[in-house]
Amino acid sequence: MQKATVLLLALLLLLPLSTAQDAEGSQEDAAQREVDIATRCGGTGDSCNEPAGELCCRRLKCVNSRCCPTTDGC
């Protein structure tokens, strides 16, 4: 049992630790993805049921079967 515990601890020590810079980069990447989606989808009025519309409508609103930035419409 002790050998298993020591082995587990050794494996955990070998795992790379995320750094603050990694987290910051991930946040920047996520923000850029949001901008890309908003740019590509904003006000396009794609059908909510089409493949492009499905991606857009996850972030936007489906109004009268069209993807729109707000519930007020496109």
Swiss-Prot record:
Post-translational modification: Contains disulfide bonds.
Cell location: Secreted
Tissues and organs where the protein is expressed, per its UniProt entry: Expressed by the venom gland.
Superkingdom: Eukaryota
Keywords: Disulfide bond, Hydroxylation, Secreted, Signal, Toxin
Gene Ontology molecular functions: toxin activity
GO cellular component entries: extracellular region
Family as reported in the entry's similarity comment: Belongs to the conotoxin Y superfamily.
Propeptide: 21-40
Modified residues (4-hydroxyproline): P51
Keyword Disulfide bond: yes
The keyword Nuclease belongs to this UniProt entry's keyword annotation: no
Secretion signal, residue range per the UniProt entry: 1-20
First-listed, main subcellular location of the protein, grouped into a coarse class: secreted
Domain note: The cysteine framework is XVII (C-C-CC-C-CC-C).
Designated name of the protein: Conotoxin ca17a
